[in-house]
UniProtKB/Swiss-Prot annotation:
It is found in: Cell inner membrane. HAMAP family: ATP_synth_gamma_bact (MF_00815). This is ATP synthase gamma chain. GO terms for biological process: proton motive force-driven plasma membrane ATP synthesis. It is a peripheral membrane protein. One of its GO terms (cellular component) is plasma membrane. It holds the Pfam family ATP-synt. GO terms for molecular function: ATP binding; proton-transporting ATP synthase activity, rotational mechanism. F-type ATPases have 2 components, CF(1) - the catalytic core - and CF(0) - the membrane proton channel. CF(1) has five subunits: alpha(3), beta(3), gamma(1), delta(1), epsilon(1). CF(0) has three main subunits: a, b and c. It comes from Pectobacterium carotovorum subsp. carotovorum (strain PC1). CDD domains: F1-ATPase_gamma. Keywords: ATP synthesis, Cell inner membrane, Cell membrane, CF(1), Hydrogen ion transport, Ion transport, Membrane, Transport.
């Protein structure tokens, strides 16, 4: 019965792992709902700032903020949003693959790249594969704040202000639904052109003081910060959804493995009983 005992031990081990993955699945589901609430709460703020900036730019054609103007591209920057923890399927690696493809397309044109990394997985990945890392932040937890993101954002905006960067992108996962998350590389600077016709059709009830220039200087920075924060909360919701799905798959696979081991155990036990009966019958015949 040594073989049967060993199989029983394996079954118990898989059952214990199943309990862990089931608990992690339930925790991820709870955290995902909270992340979705934060994601929904931050979205109107980012969209409103985008509309106000678009209206200001349209209403004051004499002044063009540097963040609104295209220029020759010699170096681009990426604010990369990853997770701090693993066990979330291919969420991070799919994001990194998309980023590397985008970086290669710029590299083929002779354009250099800078990286500002958010999340320990990005820090670990680009620490291994290489890359010009100019800023990083990790350990933000499940309730990130804008203040924690100021460091990397400030570094990239300063580089853009000084002409060391000509484009700035945010790289993160967009939460679509529980089963689907999409890796995105989104340009934030210079501000991508919007549908001017749509903005002109809207009714605006704002009076700006002191002047559009002063407001643009502040609002454009707030806009970039809000887009990075939105990327972080969407990535967090994507992380929890991916982890929930991964842990459910692990739990289900554990159930299938237990059934297979149970079948092997039954066969081993049957073989052992058959052997014992054969020995008993053989002994009786000898007497």
């Amino acid at each position: 019965m040594a073989g049967a005992k060993e199989i029983r031990s394996k079954i118990a081990s898989v059952q214990n792992t199943q309990k862990i993955t089931k608990a992690m699945e339930m925790v991820a589901a709870s955290k995902m709902r909270k992340s979705q609430d934060r994601m929904a709460a931050s979205r109107p703020y980012a969209e409103t700032i985008r509309n106000v900036i678009g209206h200001l730019a349209l209403g004051n054609l004499e002044y063009k903020h540097p963040y609104l103007e295209e220029r020759d591209v010699k170096r681009v920057g990426y604010l990369v949003v990853s997770t701090d923890r693993g066990l979330c399927g291919g969420l991070n690696i799919n994001l990194f693959k998309k980023l590397l493809a985008d970086m290669k397309s710029w590299s083929d044109k002779g354009v250099e790249t800078d990286l500002a990394l958010i999340g320990s997985k990005a820090v670990s990945f680009f620490g291994s594969v290489g890359g010009n890392i100019v800023a990083q932040v990790t350990g933000m937890g499940d309730n990130p704040s804008v203040s924690e993101l100021i460091g990397p954002v400030k570094v990239m905006l300063q580089a853009y202000d000084e002409g060391r960067l000509d484009k700035l992108y945010i790289v993160s996962n967009k939460f679509i639904n529980t089963m689907s998350q999409e890796p995105l590389v989104v340009q934030v600077l210079p501000l991508p052109p919007s549908d001017d016709g749509e903005l002109k059709k809207k009714s605006w009830d704002y009076l700006y003081e002191p002047d559009p220039k002063s407001l643009l200087d502040t609002l454009l920075r707030r806009y970039v910060e809000s887009q990075v924060y939105q990327g972080v909360v969407e990535n967090l919701a994507s992380e929890q959804a991916a982890r929930m799905v991964a842990m459910k798959a692990a739990t289900d696979n554990g159930g299938s493995l237990i059934k297979e081991l149970q079948l092997v155990y039954n066969k081993a036990r049957q073989a052992s009983i058959t052997q014992e009966l054969t020995e008993i019958v053989g002994g009786a015949s000898a007497v």
